[in-house]
Amino acid sequence: MTFDLDIKNTVRTIPDYPKPGILFRDITTLLADARAFRRAVDELVHPWAGSKIDKVAGIEARGFILGGAVAHQLSAGFVPIRKKGKLPHKTVSMSYALEYGTDEMEMHVDAVQPGERVILVDDLIATGGTAEGAVKLLRQIGATVVAACFIIDLPDLGGAAKLRALDVPVRSLIAFDGH
């Protein structure tokens, strides 16, 4: 079985969630499969193994799981990027576009030092609004965003292209057509 098919087969698709017409790509089944989880993390890490990565930033919530594992393998620190109001210390924030409206994310102001090399990690990239906001937030405090990594890309929705337009290389392990 090829790597792509192996990983794709561990992702559960839930139709009409969270609303009619949406095909939700659920990675909890991938996370529960020890072999698939290890292979996915190894593949996310591979391009940067042996290079200097200072921090891995994970987007709430599934990006925490993947980002923590990636940070561990790279011997890098981990930085949580959370929804507004969830972090206890002084924060820096960024508004970002959602399908209907806007939201705000934040991180601790001292989580990344200027010039540190950071990889952004999340489970999936769709329209790219959240990831774009995270890149801008990291850059706002002086981070060098080396790349953005995802298990799943939904290329029809254009998110990866949006990040590449910001000069951020994008690594996705698998892609699903549609939304």
Curated annotation (Swiss-Prot):
Coiled-coil boundaries: none
Pathway membership: Purine metabolism; AMP biosynthesis via salvage pathway; AMP from adenine: step 1/1
EC main group: transferase
CDD domains assigned: PRTases_typeI
Record's GO cellular component terms: cytoplasm
InterPro entries attached to this UniProt entry: Ade_phspho_trans (IPR005764), PRibTrfase_dom (IPR000836), PRTase-like (IPR029057), UPRTase/APRTase (IPR050054)
Enzyme Commission code: 2.4.2.7
Subcellular location: Cytoplasm
GO biological process, one term: AMP salvage
Keywords of the record: Cytoplasm, Glycosyltransferase, Purine salvage, Transferase
Molecular function via GO: adenine binding; adenine phosphoribosyltransferase activity; AMP binding
Chief localization: cytoplasm
Keyword Transport (UniProt): no
Reactions performed catalytically: AMP + diphosphate = 5-phospho-alpha-D-ribose 1-diphosphate + adenine
Subunit (UniProt): Homodimer.
Task performed by this protein: Catalyzes a salvage reaction resulting in the formation of AMP, that is energically less costly than de novo synthesis.
Family membership noted in the UniProt record: Belongs to the purine/pyrimidine phosphoribosyltransferase family.
PANTHER family xref list: ADENINE PHOSPHORIBOSYLTRANSFERASE
Name this protein carries in UniProt: Adenine phosphoribosyltransferase
Gene encoding the protein: apt
